[in-house]
């Protein structure tokens, strides 16, 4: 089953902003309501992506390490966050393979899943990345980096690395919405069908409607018609969902199928980002994986 809300899961999307469980935007990182679509760069379609290694809960995997410039972020004010990805030789990695139009996808998730942001940082020549963070509410957060790096042996390695972040101040923890198969955002309704099982590839289908009518004008967003991110409620593990629908101009919808692989059972929070009229919308729901 899935839970109602107005933020999102992970297939292929990006943006900045934050939404709470009531579907309203808050001054913390998440693109829940609506966000102008960012400019992209040529890359590989999401449906060709290999599955990243691990569950996204470690800063190191396969010899690569996420090295943050800091793990403490000031509350309620936009700031910049710098980090590097080091390789097996300990040197900063500067060679990445584009994935869904970007060299690296950066996610911010608050521990109670009320804050979410999908950002695309820039990389300097020395391998230092800079992400412009929106204002973040006090509390515990986790930053995820999703990328495909080139190993010194010229092998490509898809990875999700993460690190915990702390935003000082009085934090209010919100309960996770109960599972439901619909979510509403900006007048749109997103309905999910499918029964995923842990450890197996499971197709999930999202149906998009506006005022009760099927949506057929979804625009390409990061080389696909939607971007879905899944975060496990119990431990903030990360799951990657792959879009199956080919892109055919501004005519996406009314349904979109993704290939989901959830490593563990339990409740997962989904963040579904899709674009219409040049605006990225983020729908959020809770899904129970058996």
Sequence positions of predicted segments:
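Beta-strand-rich structural segments
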Residues: 78-91, 145, 201-213
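Aromatic sugar-binding surface patches on proteins
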Residues: 115, 124-130, 248-257
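Residue-level recognition of secondary-structure-to-loop junctions
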Residues: 123, 129-137, 262-263, 274
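Surface-exposed interaction/gating patches
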Residues: 173-240, 254-271, 276, 281
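Extracytoplasmic low-complexity, Pro/Thr/Ser/Ala/Gly-rich segments
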Residues: 23-104, 182
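Transition segment at domain starts
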Residues: 45-64, 69, 160-199
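Bacterial signal peptide processing site
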Residues: 14-18
């Amino acid at each position: 089953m899935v839970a109602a809300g107005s933020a999102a899961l992970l297939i292929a999307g990006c943006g900045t902003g934050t939404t709470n469980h009531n579907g309203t935007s808050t001054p913390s990182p998440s693109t829940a309501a609506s966000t102008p679509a960012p400019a992209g760069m040529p890359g590989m379609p999401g449906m060709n992506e290999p599955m990243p290694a691990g569950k996204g809960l470690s800063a190191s995997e396969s010899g690569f390490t996420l090295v943050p410039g800091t793990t403490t972020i000031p509350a309620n004010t936009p700031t910049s966050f710098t980090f590097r990805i080091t390789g097996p030789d300990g040197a900063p990695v500067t060679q990445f393979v584009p994935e869904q139009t970007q060299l690296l996808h950066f996610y911010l998730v608050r521990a109670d899943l009320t804050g979410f942001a999908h950002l695309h940082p820039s990389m300097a020549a020395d391998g230092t990345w800079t992400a412009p963070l929106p204002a973040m509410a006090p509390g515990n957060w986790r930053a995820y980096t999703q990328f495909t790096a080139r190993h010194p042996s010229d092998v490509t390695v898809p990875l999700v690395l993460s690190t915990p972040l702390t935003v000082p101040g009085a934090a209010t923890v919100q309960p996770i919405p109960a599972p439901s198969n619909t979510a509403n955002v900006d007048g749109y309704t997103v309905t999910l069908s499918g029964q995923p099982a842990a450890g197996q590839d499971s197709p999930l289908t999202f149906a998009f409607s506006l005022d009760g009518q099927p949506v057929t004008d979804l625009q390409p967003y990061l080389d696909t018609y939607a971007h879905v991110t899944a975060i496990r409620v119990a431990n903030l593990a990360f799951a990657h969902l792959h879009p199956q629908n080919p892109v055919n101009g501004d005519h996406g919808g009314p349904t979109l199928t993704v290939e989901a692989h959830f490593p563990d059972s339990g409740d997962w929070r989904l963040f579904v980002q899709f674009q219409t009229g040049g605006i990225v919308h983020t729908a959020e729901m809770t899904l129970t994986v058996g």
